[in-house]
């Protein structure tokens, strides 16, 4: 099995800390359908801020499994057009994709991604083609007997200099993982993730900016519990006093409801608390 790409080395703990929490969006709604010939359509709408306008996006996705070609086309209510062309199976382990974004008269971007995977390493490169100063971001991960190490760097092509870099090292056992990262800003993270049993997951991450004198260590702890096959409960607590709770329920096949809240345990009398919900349909 190939190692993950660099951004997925800490995917277990990052998903536990960030995924399926609904407080950040007061309201969210999405519908996904698939036709008989495999074309996927989706409609996503969310309200980024309370009493604010909706942000909406429609998308169509077509994949040809025989040739490895894929096309995804999206259009938002801000008149932003997003296109992704995927080229897989050109050679074993190689995948290329071109991602473009266009808002007429406002902004445009184009990124070419290349990923090459082999049993013991995964390499990836991203070329940003539309900036005044084109950039390249590359990463490499290697794995051996549960140990996964990786490095990432950004290169400013016009200036001919490295703009950023980061390193990560993780150990994966059957039911837990340990990891650490360090970047050029001297921001260091240490994390652990554990599958306690088939119903319970726990994890924590500590972050420190070593560049700042007397820097505090920021700690987050999260847990995920599955009461039954159709529901899940998540909770997250940070050392700053922010407590986040979320509940997700499969109402019926293809229909999922999520609700979440966030409150500051140190400022319970102040109006800083958040509440949000999400409703998803998949057919």
From Swiss-Prot:
Subcellular location field: Mitochondrion outer membrane
Keywords on record: ATP-binding, Ion transport, Lipid transport, Membrane, Mitochondrion, Mitochondrion outer membrane, Nucleotide-binding, Phosphoprotein, Porin, Transmembrane, Transmembrane beta strand, Transport
GO cellular component: cytoplasm; mitochondrial inner-outer membrane contact site; mitochondrial intermembrane space; mitochondrial outer membrane; mitochondrion; pore complex
Domain of life of the source: Eukaryota
Pfam families in UniProt: Porin_3 (PF01459)
Modified residues (Phosphothreonine): 117
Annotated signal sequence range: none
Cystine pairings recorded for this chain: none
Residues given in the record as ATP binding sites: 11, 19
GO biological process: apoptotic process; cell redox homeostasis; DNA transport; mitochondrion organization; monoatomic ion transport; phospholipid translocation; positive regulation of protein import into nucleus
Predominant location: mitochondrion
GO molecular function: ATP binding; phospholipid scramblase activity; porin activity; ubiquinone binding; voltage-gated monoatomic anion channel activity
Residue positions where Phosphoserine is found in the record: 109
Cross-referenced PANTHER family: GH26960P-RELATED, VOLTAGE-DEPENDENT ANION-SELECTIVE CHANNEL
Domain comment as written in the entry: Consists mainly of membrane-spanning sided beta-sheets. 19 strands distributed along the entire VDAC protein, have the potential to adopt transmembrane beta pleated sheet structures, which rolled together may form a 'beta-barrel' type structure, possessing pore dimensions.
Similarity field: Belongs to the eukaryotic mitochondrial porin family.
Primary role: Non-selective voltage-gated ion channel that mediates the transport of anions and cations through the mitochondrion outer membrane. The channel adopts an open conformation at low or zero membrane potential and a closed conformation at potentials above 30-40 mV. The open state has a weak anion selectivity whereas the closed state is cation-selective. Is the major permeability factor of the mitochondrial outer membrane. Catalyzes the scrambling of phospholipids across the outer mitochondrial membrane; the mechanism is unrelated to channel activity and is capable of translocating both anionic and zwitterionic phospholipids.
Quaternary data: Homodimer. Interacts with FCJ1. Interacts with AIM5. Interacts.
Name of the protein in question: Non-selective voltage-gated ion channel 1
Taxonomic lineage: Eukaryota, Fungi, Dikarya, Ascomycota, Saccharomycotina
